Amino acid sequence: MKYNILLTGSQGTLGKEIFKRIDKSKHNLYQHSFSKNYDLKIDFSNPIEIQKAENFIKEKNINCLINNAGVYSNKNFIDLNENEIYSIFNINLIAPIILSKYLYKNLTENSKEGLIINVNSLAGKYANYDETIYSSSKFGLTGFSSCLSINQKKSKIKVIDCHLGAMKTKMTSNRKNYDSMMNPDEIANFIVDLIESNNEYIISSFEVRNSK
């Protein structure tokens, strides 16, 4: 199937690796970032700005959404100010929900097939010390993905929730176990394989973690 893909968080380490691996001769790929020189420039920390994506998704006939944008925090939640908390939830949870809504609405109204891939975290299934707000936002994404995936039986839109272990990225570069983390290129291969898979089985959620 040919997809018109919107990849959020294209400026990040994993986003760049996903971009490299998607077959541009087969799919139309549109990149999002909060900075210029990308197809869709939106600051997801601002919920008003997120609304700008509605027309973009409709005009480009987006039928594959990769919710990859995310922000990490391991601050104790009492040390985070209110704006930081809002920002984490807006980027990690609210933006994927609203973007999925726009795509879902456009595709279901036209009875078209589609795919939503939520790049989640193991922190969205297992609570971690000093990751209260980050983990809570990812738990929210897990719940949203689970609820939305129930509709797969009634719609033509697949929803896949990817719970990833820690990767070597800029966000994790200061962590003590950085050297033992997974390589983003390997994770990107998993995600691109999901796009290219044409099987009839429904994969609603899975985990990827380091075996070491």
Task: List each language-model region with its residue ranges.
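Conserved NAD(P)H cofactor-binding loop of Rossmann-fold oxidoreductase domains
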Residues: 68-74
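Substrate-binding pocket helix/loop in short-chain dehydrogenase/reductase
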Residues: 76-77, 84-86
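Residue(s) in the substrate-gating loop at a strand-loop-helix junction
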Residues: 121
